[in-house]
Regions:
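Conserved alpha-helical substructure of the radical SAM core
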Residues: 1-119, 130-157, 181-182, 188-214
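Catalytic cores of alpha/beta
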Residues: 166-180
């Protein structure tokens, strides 16, 4: 049997996503109960070293913080390849810079054969700053777009994950065009939480757009 691992590397994040567990939905502030900290590299290695089974992929998720906030994210990525050939990173895209993404893409894309290396999942929910900010408050859209562009145009594996809200579903055509321009696969998913929940009527219109653009 093959096992996958999901690690929360950090509880730090610059975003104030209102449906995120780390964020107070009413104020946008960090939850009072949340202790901000970064995982130690030794903790990561100590969890994996004794594991006796084959590992499919290691994922650094953004459940309580963005992994790119971790000051040693590079070391975690590099160390992961002692245990697997496939590393996934989830991010809002607004951290680091295009040079960082370019170097990572050129170093870790298909570096041990086809479909191995680093796979980025970018959570960006709009085609402009104001729209993305409605959920991803605190994220610089222009920076996120530049980072996505650097990753995908340099051969990086991954996907653009676009949550559909009542305020952004009409941007499906533009998002598809932008994804195509940078060679990115785009994945749309309907938000099912109360903040920004799309109406049934608009959801049906969005479904028709998704069919039209075959996504």
């Amino acid at each position: 049997m093959i096992y996958n691992f999901d690690f929360w590397l950090t509880t730090y994040c610059q975003a104030k996503c209102r449906s995120c567990a780390r964020t107070n939905e009413n104020t946008g502030d960090q939850q009072e109960w949340l202790n901000t900290s970064h995982m130690k590299l030794d903790t990561f290695k100590n969890r994996l070293d004794p594991f006796p089974h084959e590992i499919g992929y290691i994922q650094f998720c953004g459940e309580m913080g963005d992994p790119c906030m971790h000051p040693k994210i590079n070391e975690f990525v590099e160390t992961s390849f002692n245990y697997t050939n496939d590393v996934h990173v989830l991010t809002n895209g607004g951290l680091r810079n295009p040079d960082w993404y370019t170097r990572l893409a050129k170093t870790y894309t298909n570096f041990r054969g086809k479909r191995t290396g680093v796979y980025f999942k970018f959570g960006v929910d709009g085609t402009d700053h104001d729209t993305n900010w409605l959920y991803r408050e605190g994220v610089n859209f222009d920076k996120a777009h530049e980072n996505m562009h650097a990753w995908f145009t340099n051969g990086g594996r991954g996907a653009w994950h676009f949550l559909l809200f009542d305020w952004n579903w009409h941007q499906i055509p533009e998002a598809c065009r932008m994804a195509k321009d940078m060679g990115a696969y785009i994945n749309f998913k309907f938000n099912n939480r109360s903040h920004g929940l799309i109406s049934n009527e608009d959801k049906q219109a969005a479904v028709e757009l998704l069919k039209e653009f075959d996504v």
